[in-house]
Regions:
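Short hydrophobic targeting helices and cationic amphipathic motifs
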Residues: 5-10
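Charged phosphate-binding loop/patch that engages nucleotide di/tri-phosphates or the phosphate backbone
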Residues: 168-199
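Short, Lys/Arg-enriched N-terminal segments with co-localized hydrophobic residues
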Residues: 23-34
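A short gly/proline-enriched turn/hairpin at secondary-structure junctions
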Residues: 69-72
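Unchanged
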Residues: 75-175
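Conserved N-terminal beta-strand and adjoining loop/helix that marks the start
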Residues: 36-56, 78
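Cysteine-centered motifs
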Residues: 14-15
């Protein structure tokens, strides 16, 4: 009890602790700088999420007004498989879980197409110094209907299901719009298997 009262009421003890904390923080400051988020890997995915009727999901970015897009995201590690990147980003940005009962793993299809583009200036600080180009791999994800979406509010603030041409017109990025406009051809070449069946 005496020790408790001493710690609670002794101003000198509080001052020493405060000074120690400030001195310790000063010594750790260089290390804290080094522990910042690592640079983004300049290799990413774009996932066009659509229904059998070719309605397409587009989501609105939180950091840019009127910037609508499909799901996108970079690899977490250099050796991360692109399909894993795609599934992770879909779950993080929309709440849609690939491998669930109504969205089987086979619904995610690698379109075997990639583009390289110049990174927008406002995003260059996220990459290592000197990195100005990103390679993007395109995927399609067919869902059974216009499913409800749970956004990550830090990244996106709104979403819409639109006919594919309207979705393409709303996209900020020309390459994203191009991917969506290719949807009729790409979707028609796929055989969407019933859940539980295999090729």
């Amino acid at each position: 009890m005496r020790l408790f009262r001493f710690l609670r009421y002794s101003r000198s003890t509080c001052c020493v602790l405060g000074d120690d904390a400030r001195r310790t923080r000063g010594r750790l400051a260089p290390y804290e700088t080094k522990m910042t988020k690592p640079p983004k890997i300049p290799e990413s995915v774009l996932v066009v999420i659509y229904t059998p009727e070719l309605d397409v999901l587009v989501i609105k970015r939180a950091d840019q007004p009127d910037f609508w897009q499909s799901v996108t995201g970079s690899k977490d590690t250099l050796d991360e498989p692109l399909a894993v990147t795609a599934a992770r980003e879909v779950a993080e940005e929309t709440g849609i879980v690939i491998g669930a009962a109504d969205v089987p793993a086979a619904a995610l299809v690698d379109w075997q197409h990639r583009i390289e583009y110049t990174i927008y200036p406002q995003y260059l600080h996220r990459y290592a110094p000197g990195v100005t180009r990103n390679t993007e791999h395109w995927f399609g994800l067919c869902v059974p209907r216009r499913v409800d979406v749970t956004l990550s509010p830090r990244e996106h603030v709104d979403y819409a299901w639109l006919p594919y041409r309207d979705a393409a017109a709303r996209c900020f990025s020309p390459s994203n719009a191009d991917a969506i406009l290719q949807l009729p051809v790409r979707a028609s070449s796929l055989v969407h298997l019933p859940h539980g069946s295999s090729a």
